[in-house]
């Protein structure tokens, strides 16, 4: 795919038409964290379940200062009409608004710039549609995480929320989150922190797992 973003790249300050009007991306983000996520097409089954779950979790993202914005190659008019279906799927009033805007990228200009097109999935005209991409940007507008799923596999938005919590925690504290970590679980002390400094940084205690190598790199501490 042409285009695309690498970790640490700054988000392009694009302009786009959305379900809340025309936006400039950096102005939309402000000082918040941001999630930009694309889907293949409106009025399709997997996408409806995905955006339905994203809408359900929107309050959890909002209370963590995260702004959400979706994107596909459909028009604003289609986005608004489809939003009724998404709300109905969630068992709510079938209104045209969601807790986040959706970008109209009929031209595919943004999808090309951001490397979002799936060459294996095409529309009725034989043109590629957007894959299931997730970009997470920090308050500095730089890319902190990217996820790329094919059209046939829906994403787990609870996992995306878990990742946001980890990213925000590790941006503030000198820790890392281990496999299958959940909010409130113990975290790992970074291996470049000397033992004496670790004791001062983590007053709740540092617990080291003894290993056959004798190396003391598996160090846990309660979540700060």
Swiss-Prot record:
Residues 31-40 are annotated as: Required and sufficient for targeting to lysosomes and lamellar bodies. The modification N6-succinyllysine is found at residue 209. The modification N6-acetyllysine is found at residues 63, 209. Its main location: cytoplasm. It catalyses: a hydroperoxide + 2 glutathione = an alcohol + glutathione disulfide + H2O; a 1,2-diacyl-sn-glycero-3-phosphocholine + H2O = a 1-acyl-sn-glycero-3-phosphocholine + a fatty acid + H(+); a 1-acyl-sn-glycero-3-phosphocholine + an acyl-CoA = a 1,2-diacyl-sn-glycero-3-phosphocholine + CoA; 1-hexadecanoyl-sn-glycero-3-phosphocholine + hexadecanoyl-CoA = 1,2-dihexadecanoyl-sn-glycero-3-phosphocholine + CoA. Irreversibly inactivated by overoxidation of Cys-47 to sulfinic acid (Cys-SO(2)H) and sulfonic acid (Cys-SO(3)H) forms upon oxidative stress. GO terms for molecular function: 1-acylglycerophosphocholine O-acyltransferase activity; calcium-independent phospholipase A2 activity; glutathione peroxidase activity; identical protein binding; peroxidase activity; peroxiredoxin activity; phospholipase A2 activity; ubiquitin protein ligase binding. Its EC number is 1.11.1.27, 3.1.1.4, 2.3.1.23. Residues 5-169 form the Thioredoxin domain. The modification Phosphotyrosine is found at residue 89. Thiol-specific peroxidase that catalyzes the reduction of hydrogen peroxide and organic hydroperoxides to water and alcohols, respectively. Can reduce H(2)O(2) and short chain organic, fatty acid, and phospholipid hydroperoxides. Also has phospholipase activity, and can therefore either reduce the oxidized sn-2 fatty acyl group of phospholipids (peroxidase activity) or hydrolyze the sn-2 ester bond of phospholipids (phospholipase activity). These activities are dependent on binding to phospholipids at acidic pH and to oxidized phospholipds at cytosolic pH. The active site is a conserved redox-active cysteine residue, the peroxidatic cysteine (C(P)), which makes the nucleophilic attack on the peroxide substrate. The peroxide oxidizes the C(P)-SH to cysteine sulfenic acid (C(P)-SOH), which then reacts with another cysteine residue, the resolving cysteine (C(R)), to form a disulfide bridge. The disulfide is subsequently reduced by an appropriate electron donor to complete the catalytic cycle. In this 1-Cys peroxiredoxin, no C(R) is present and C(P) instead forms a disulfide with a cysteine from another protein or with a small thiol molecule. Homodimer. Interacts with GSTP1; mediates PRDX6 glutathionylation and regeneration. Interacts with APEX1. Interacts with STH. May interact with FAM168B. May interact with HTR2A. This is Peroxiredoxin-6. It comes from Sus scrofa (Pig). The lineage of its organism: Eukaryota, Metazoa, Chordata, Craniata, Vertebrata.
């Amino acid at each position: 795919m042409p285009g695309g973003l690498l970790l640490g790249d700054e988000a392009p300050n694009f302009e786009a038409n959305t379900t809340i009007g025309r936006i400039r991306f950096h102005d939309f983000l402000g000082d918040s964290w941001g999630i930009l996520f694309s889907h293949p097409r409106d009025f399709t089954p997997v996408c409806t379940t995905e955006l339905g779950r994203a809408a359900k979790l929107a309050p959890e993202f909002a209370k963590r200062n995260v702004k959400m914005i979706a994107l596909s190659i459909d028009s604003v008019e289609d986005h608004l009409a489809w939003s009724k279906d998404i709300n109905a799927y969630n068992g709510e009033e079938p209104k045209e608004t969601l807790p986040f805007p959706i970008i109209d990228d009929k031209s595919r200009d943004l999808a090309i710039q951001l490397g979002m097109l799936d060459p294996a999935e095409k529309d009725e005209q034989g043109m590629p549609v957007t894959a299931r991409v997730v970009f997470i940007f920090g308050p500095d507008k730089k890319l902190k995480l990217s996820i790329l799923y094919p059209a046939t596999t829906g994403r787990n938005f609870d996992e995306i929320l878990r990742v946001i919590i980890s990213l925000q925690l590790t941006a503030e504290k000198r820790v890392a989150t281990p496999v299958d970590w959940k909010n409130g679980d113990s975290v790992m002390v970074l291996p470049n922190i000397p033992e004496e400094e670790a004791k001062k940084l983590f007053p709740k205690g540092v617990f080291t797992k003894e290993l056959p190598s004798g190396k003391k790199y598996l160090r846990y501490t309660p979540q700060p």
